[in-house]
Each structure stands twice: as C-alpha cells, then as structure tokens.
A protein has these predicted regions:
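Soluble, non-membrane globular domain cores that form compact, hydrophobic packing
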Residues: 11, 105, 109, 117-121, ...
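Catalytic and substrate-binding regions of extracellular carbohydrate-active enzymes
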Residues: 114
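Extended hydrophobic
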Residues: 30, 82-98, 213-259
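Non-catalytic, conformational "gating/processing" segments within enzyme and secreted inhibitor domains
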Residues: 1-103, 123-215
Length: 260
C-alpha cells in the first residue's frame, strides 16, 4: 500500500481475547492488499478549486473545497439520481459518482442507491459536456467484516466447529482445526485535482482450535454539493475496486470498501 496503511497487524492481535481464560490465541494472520493511484484523463484546474456551501443533510450545511472542470463525460439522470463517470489516464479505470437529485440523509441515500439503480444509469450514460463540481477529500476507515460476511452466509469460517480451512494452509491431518476469529478492512483514499490515490488491506485473524452514444451539445451540471456515493471501477472487467460515500468532505467519508 506504499506505506499508506500501517500497523494492520499488531502484537496484541496474537494474544487470547481474555488473558488467563484458557482461550486459544490467534495463530495466523491473512492479509490482502490493494493499491491504486492514477491521474485524471482530464485534470481539474487547481486554481478553480473554491470553497462552496456543502449541504450535509436536508437541514444542515457547511463548506467544502469543490474542484471544477467542464469536459465531455459520460452522464445520465433519472428521477432519483444523477450519474457521472470521470475516466483516469489511460481510461481503463474511472470514478463513478451517484448524486441524489434531492439532499437525502445518508441512510436513505444508501437504501435508494441499489445496484440496479447504478447499473441502469451506467448503461444509459452518454458522453456530453458536463459542468462538474466535485469535493476534494481524504478518508481513512477501519471496518469489521465478521458481521457483514455472516449476513452473506459465510458464518462457518468463524465457527470453531464448522470451519474447514485446513487445506488453505496445508495443515497436517492431525493438526488442530483452524477458524477465523475476526476480519478487518482498512482503507485510505485521497481525491484531489490531479487524480486519486487509494489503498486498502484486509486482515483476517485465524485461531487454531485445541460504449458511448452520440454526444449532446447542451451542457449539464453535476454539482456534488451534498452527500453522494463514489466508486472506482476497472472498466474492461467492470470490477469494483473501491466504494464509499461522502457526507461531509471536511470530516472524511464513509467506508472505502475494496473488492480486489
């Protein structure tokens, strides 16, 4: 991660959860990392970054530094959202942003922004001239994944009686059973006029058990001056590398979740 994420595993991670309880101590840490850095295909002009009002909620507002550019970009809109795609240099990667038409509380935004909504707008997007205001931001998050994976049906890897991880570590037939005790994801993302730099690492602590269309000439506005979602995507494979949300650029953002 080029030093952006440090101390993802600490000595204390290999101590029993309750010292003196007789519980097993972790015996293995699995680390998965991803790093991304790229300039914009069409850079924002630093001299045009200005302080603007940023509506953090329906009845709340602060200020944020918003970058500006006017470029030919893929854009779409429906009754609920605006969609914008900004390519990085080389155009294999892009930033996608989903901006609600109205200022919404973050939980309502997350409930409305379904995968189908994003997919439909992405397919409908056409290249046209877009006037863009986008905040600069930097975020650093740490998210526990045990509960999330459990809700996705992966409970067994955290169960000392059901986990079957021996083949992954070439365990001996007589070795103690290995299971996941916890899983954490650390992410760091910075977005500015030049481009985006992002890094993430996922750690699991294991325990031994005793196409574009014709462009449209009329410019449209995509002014991200209220909470929105963002995604860093590998375009050829449509793989999602990072995802998160911005509620207050001055205070950071929601989890930047990698999908390496």
């Amino acid at each position: 991660t080029r030093g952006r994420i440090k101390n993802i595993v600490a000595p204390g991670d290999f101590l029993p959860a309750k010292p003196g309880s007789g519980d097993d101590a972790p015996g293995l840490a699995c680390v998965n990392a991803i790093y991304f850095k790229s300039d914009w295909a069409s850079a924002f002009t630093e001299g045009e970054t200005r302080s603007h009002a940023f509506h953090t909620g329906p009845d709340a507002a602060g200020h944020a530094m918003l970058m500006h550019q006017r470029s030919m970009l893929k854009y779409a809109k429906d009754e609920h959202f605006q969609f914008l795609e900004i390519p990085y240099l080389g155009e294999d990667y892009c930033l996608q942003a989903l901006l609600p038409v109205e200022v919404l509380p973050i939980q309502e935004l997350l409930s409305q922004a379904t995968p189908d909504a994003l997919s439909n707008l992405s397919r409908q997007a056409v290249r046209q001239e877009v006037d863009v205001l986008l905040p600069t931001f930097e975020l650093r998050t740490r998210v526990g994944l045990k509960g999330l994976l459990g809700r996705l049906g992966a409970e067994s890897v955290f169960d000392s009686r059901r986990a079957e991880l021996g083949r992954m570590i070439h365990a001996r037939p007589d070795a103690e059973r290995v299971y996941m005790g916890s899983m954490w994801q650390d992410a760091w993302i910075r977005l500015d006029e030049k481009g985006t730099e992002a890094a993430a690492a996922t750690t699991s602590i294991s325990f031994p058990l005793g196409c574009s269309a014709e462009s449209i000439s009329m410019p449209v506005s995509f002014h991200a001056d209220h909470p929105f979602l963002f995604f860093i995507v590998h375009r050829p494979s449509q793989s999602l590398l990072f995802a998160g949300w911005i509620t207050d650029p001055e205070q950071g953002a929601g989890p930047g979740t990698p999908s390496p």
